[in-house]
């Protein structure tokens, strides 16, 4: 099951949703009457329309953290070495990976960096700087960009800077190769919309000595994210990571405030004290998607366990 908190499925008035997919209540939303498609949206996106109306929980969390700590989120230096260290170890948090289910990174609770797929990207790409994180954000949001494409190229020895991650990468690369700007833009538009390459575009690429592997990579892409969008996601997530390192008490308080239903938080906190489940990634061979801690309740227990490992407690009544 896949639940998108801002994805609205649109169907005609005279149609029953059950004709296409079963529906169910989403997690703990029974009392609110909010239903979700039972199937992952990728199983139905060929015959259903979805409109993304995204919330801004992360921004709200940053505002609240700024109020509680007195540290303005906009004045945080996101190039702090301790923040980048979260993508290679838990040392900056003062705990070992064994204390949090053999999870090697300090990204628990940082939503942009803690999805199963992004964790797989960290393991595969070993990011060294913010630019790498922006590229990885694009890979995690694109379609046909990583599995069977960029992942194979990375395994062959290429780096994140070499492969296609964002739509901007294509236009800039083609211009550097000497292609006319208009042609470069048109090819970028074809590829980022999943339209592949027509014979004319392929010839234009050969004319400026674009290697065959690059052309083949373009043909596999279904959708490409814009770099600026990914830079925004990454920027906010890094600011949240700052609070996790330097203001842990406030971080966990705000995290549970925005990510846990008050009706269940007592049970989650109690469970976490005796929680020994390892953080493991499972790959669905049919789709290439990674899962395990995508389950919201499991994620809450992971975060609570990490909080206790750092010697921090949280009183839900506050």
Task: Specify the residue positions occupied by each region the protein language model found.
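Noncatalytic, beta-rich nucleic-acid-contacting surfaces in large DNA/RNA-processing enzymes
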Residues: 1-318
């Amino acid at each position: 099951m896949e639940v998108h908190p801002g994805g609205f499925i649109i169907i005609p008035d005279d149609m029953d949703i059950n004709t296409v997919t079963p529906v169910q209540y989403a997690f703990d939303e029974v009392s609110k009457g909010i239903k979700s498609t039972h199937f992952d949206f990728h199983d139905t996106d060929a015959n259903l329309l979805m409109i993304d109306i995204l919330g801004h929980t992360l921004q709200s969390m940053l505002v609240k953290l700024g109020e509680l700590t007195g540290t303005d989120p906009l004045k945080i230096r996101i190039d702090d070495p301790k923040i980048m260290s979260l993508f290679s170890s838990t040392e900056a948090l003062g705990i070992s990976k064994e204390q949090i289910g053999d999870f090697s990174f300090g990204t628990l609770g940082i939503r942009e960096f803690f999805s199963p797929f992004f964790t797989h990207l960290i393991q595969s790409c070993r990011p060294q700087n913010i630019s790498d994180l922006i590229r990885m954000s694009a890979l995690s949001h694109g379609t046909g960009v990583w599995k069977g494409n960029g992942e194979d190229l990375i395994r062959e020895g290429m780096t994140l800077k070499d492969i296609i991650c964002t739509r901007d990468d294509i236009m800039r690369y083609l211009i550097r190769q000497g292609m006319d700007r208009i042609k470069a833009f048109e090819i970028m538009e074809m590829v980022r919309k999943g339209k592949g390459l027509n014979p004319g575009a392929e010839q234009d690429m050969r004319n400026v000595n674009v290697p065959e592997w690059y052309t083949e990579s373009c043909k596999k892409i279904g959708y490409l994210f814009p770099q600026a969008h990914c830079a925004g996601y990454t920027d906010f997530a890094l600011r949240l990571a700052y609070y996790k390192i330097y203001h842990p008490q406030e971080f966990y308080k705000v995290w549970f405030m925005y990510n846990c239903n008050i009706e269940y938080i007592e049970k989650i906190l109690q469970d976490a004290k005796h929680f020994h489940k390892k953080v493991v990634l499972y790959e669905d061979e049919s789709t290439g998607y990674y899962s395990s801690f995508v389950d919201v309740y499991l994620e809450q227990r992971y975060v609570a366990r990490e909080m206790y490992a750092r010697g921090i407690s949280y009183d839900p009544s506050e």
